[in-house]
Amino acid sequence: LVAAGAPAANAQTPITAQAAIDTALVNNLLVKNERLKAEYQQLLIKSGANLPQTTIIGEYGQINSSFSDNRFVINQNINFPSVYSNQKSVLREEWRSSMLNVALKEVDLKRQVSQVYYMFTYLQQKKTLLQQNDSLYGEFLNKANLRFKVGESNILEKTTAETQRGQIALQLNLLNTDLDLLQAQFQLLLNTTTLLVPQEGDFKMSRLEMIDTASVTQHPTIQLLQQ
């Protein structure tokens, strides 16, 4: 049986987990947006020490006498140095917060890409096993049909073979739907139109790793909350 729904294999390009993460960090729109915000906040720091622009007002007419004359008013507001210093400190802290937001988005993006990548790989391997079982039950069904025709078996054996193969076909169809959804999510995270799929043999079971206090305190979320 051929299950419908899976993308054409010849249109897919294999990619490693690390390459997928690197691509996402460069292309992802949410991360790009956070970086632009951080760059904008960095530019604003310079404005904290800028003096207000000088205002010049010119007037012409009978101002001080019956004769026509001119009058110019020059206005310049200058605050105490501490005002500019405080403004710059506030802008600098806002920039630091925006940089932590960038780091936070990057950490979350890496997590999402890794999850989708390895789930994608797991389902691909599951599909391979189901296809192998489909072939086995296909042979079993052919033999059951032949045995039924020559009277060597009853209808139960034939029906059982048909049911088993039908269940596998249903599982394959559902699995292909899941693969299509993961493919779309993968493309969205990496922000690419290329049909990228996990490289064959790049699957690894996740394992629990020791978590030390230092690594926890360096997490962007913790740093952002500590500000």
PLM segments and residue spans:
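C-terminal segment of classical bacterial N-terminal signal peptides
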Residues: V2-N10
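Small/polar-residue-enriched beta-strand and adjacent coil segments characteristic
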Residues: T54-K105, T221-Q227
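Periplasmic alpha-helical coiled-coil/stalk elements that build and connect Gram-negative outer-membrane
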Residues: D108-L224
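Bacterial Sec-pathway N-terminal export signals of envelope proteins
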Residues: A9-T55, I78, N86, E152-L156, ...
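Generic alpha-helical secondary structure signal
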Residues: I15-A19, D69, E139
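Sec/SRP-type N-terminal targeting helices
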Residues: L30-L36, A49, N79-L109, Q131, ...
